[in-house]
Swiss-Prot record:
Changing residue 208 to I: In strain: cv. Maringa. Residues 1-52, 95-108, 159-160, 221-459 are extracellular. The lineage of its organism: Eukaryota, Viridiplantae, Streptophyta, Embryophyta, Tracheophyta. GO terms for cellular component: plant-type vacuole membrane; plasma membrane. Belongs to the aromatic acid exporter (TC 2.A.85) family. Malate transporter critical for aluminum tolerance. Permeable to chloride, nitrate, sulfate and malate. It is found in: Cell membrane. It comes from Triticum aestivum. GO terms for biological process: malate transport; monoatomic ion transmembrane transport. Residues 130-137, 182-199 are cytoplasmic. This is Aluminum-activated malate transporter 1.
């Protein structure tokens, strides 16, 4: 019996060890899969935008440089323990784009300077009140902190200040409260204010140097690429609509499937990115083809029109997908149906061509080629189609075709507004004239110059 009992105990122990081994193996396998998945995400983020790797290295370099202020004894003796503020400044100010770093850096430096001056003035006023009694100074400081913090916080609700100076107002409240409250216990208040400002100035200077001079990422270039990319996406949708719904061998059921263009949906979600990039671009100095007072607000207007156009596309796509999945009655007037189909194809073709031309002109910063003929053809087709549908008595029997045509005609109107907006942008931003560019190339070739040609684009 003892032998059998011992064998049973050994068997249970072996089973327990085997279960633990399987559990450990599954845990290690799961950990390995998660690590591999995380590595793929890291690699994907780096491949999607290699500038992210450069930015990460720049942040590390900036922190390494600002650490010298804390590690070198002469510098540390000059700034004291406040030198740590330089390190904190680099951490909170360093941003991905030059404009964002300039915005936060200048906001932080200016807010610290103004708040320090006001806090020193508050301390002087509190010292005068101390003559009236021993508790006069803390009471005055408390009242001043209350009113200044309340007023500054209320300013953050103003849209203009919220958009550009929200971070600066926050730093103002922090610095004023820190210096004003510390003035009651610290004797060398002026020295404290100086040290805080100098350390923040050092941190901001290092951030700006590493951001501007080492592989800079300009918000202006990003918003410019975003605008031209959105135009390309809209053109891609209309081309897909023309091919799948109004072409000679089109099958409407194919539209809305996995292979149908859906890029217009990303245009609808681009407002937040576009607004932030435009705000940061206004802080950036002149660079490349972007002048000092470049019309960044016009990019926001163009983005608004693109999103309105994308909304019309979304309505059109939803209706086409819905009608393709339902049984629609046969048209009583095949001739009208054929005419509507042909006209819709013409509107789609001309609209996509206009958007492609506008995208190329925006991307290369050249004056758009005259789109009056192409746009006029699309508008004329839309107007004639509206008149035809309004006068036809068999409209109810081709209602699904009529609705599609009406939505597409509205889409043509949106494209026309986009074309007008790009023309205004080209005029305000002083886009290059393609004819002047062409003349430069012809003149260079005619003189037989073997030097490299300038970076020009012939449209």
């Amino acid at each position: 019996m003892d032998i059998d009992h011992g064998r049973e105990s050994d068997g249970e122990m072996v089973g327990t060890i085997a279960s633990c081994g399987l559990l450990l193996h599954s845990l290690l396998a799961g950990l390995g899969r998660r690590a591999a998945g995380f590595a793929r995400k890291v690699g994907g983020a780096a491949r999607e935008d290699p500038r992210r790797v450069a930015h990460s290295l720049k942040v590390g370099l900036a922190l390494a440089l600002v650490s010298v202020v804390y590690f070198v004894t002469p510098l540390f003796n000059g700034l004291g323990v406040s030198a740590i503020w330089a390190v904190l400044t680099v951490v909170v100010v360093m941003e991905y784009t030059v404009g964002a770093t300039l915005s936060k850096g200048l906001n932080r430096a200016l807010a610290t300077l103004v708040a320090g001056c006001i806090a020193v003035g508050a301390h002087q006023l509190a010292e005068l009140a101390e003559r009236c009694g021993d508790q006069g100074e803390p009471i005055v400081l408390t009242v001043l902190v209350f009113f200044v913090a309340s007023a500054a916080t209320f300013l953050r609700f103003i849209p203009e200040i919220k958009a550009k100076y929200d971070y600066g107002v926050t730093i103002f409240i922090l610095t004023f409260g820190l210096v004003a409250v510390s003035s009651y216990r610290v004797e060398e208040l002026i020295q404290l204010a100086h040290q805080r400002f100098y350390t923040i100035a050092v941190g901001v200077f290092i951030c700006l140097c590493t951001t501007v001079f080492l592989f800079p990422v300009w918000a202006g270039e990003d918003v410019h690429k975003l605008a031209s990319g959105n135009l390309d996406k809209l053109a891609q949708f209309i081309e897909g609509m023309e091919f799948n719904c109004f072409g000679e061998n089109s099958v409407a059921n194919n539209f809305g499937g996995k292979d149908s263009p859906q890029m217009h949906k990303s245009v609808l979600n681009s407002k937040a990115t576009e607004d932030s990039l435009c705000t940061f671009a206004k802080w950036e100095p002149r660079h490349g083809q972007f002048r000092f007072r470049h019309p960044w607000s016009q990019y926001q207007k163009l983005g608004t029109l693109c999103r309105q156009c994308a909304s019309s596309m979304e309505a059109l796509a939803s209706y086409v997908i819905t009608t393709s999945k339902t049984q629609c009655p046969a048209a009583a007037n095949p001739e009208l149906s054929c005419k509507v189909r042909k006209t819709c194809g013409e509107m789609s073709l001309h609209s996509s061509k206009v958007l492609r031309d506008l995208a190329m002109a925006t991307r290369t910063m050249t004056v758009p080629s005259p789109v009056n003929i192409t746009m006029a053809t699309a508008v004329k087709a839309a107007e004639s189609l509206r008149s035809e549908l309004a006068e036809n008595t068999a409209l109810l029997q081709v209602m699904h075709v009529a609705v599609t045509a009406t939505l597409l005609a509205d889409l043509v109107d949106r494209v026309k507004e986009i074309a007008e907006c790009v023309d205004v942008l080209a005029r305000l931003a002083h886009f290059k004239n393609p004819e002047d560019t062409k003349n430069v190339v012809v003149s260079t070739v005619s003189r037989g110059i073997d030097e490299p040609l300038p970076d020009v684009v012939i449209l």
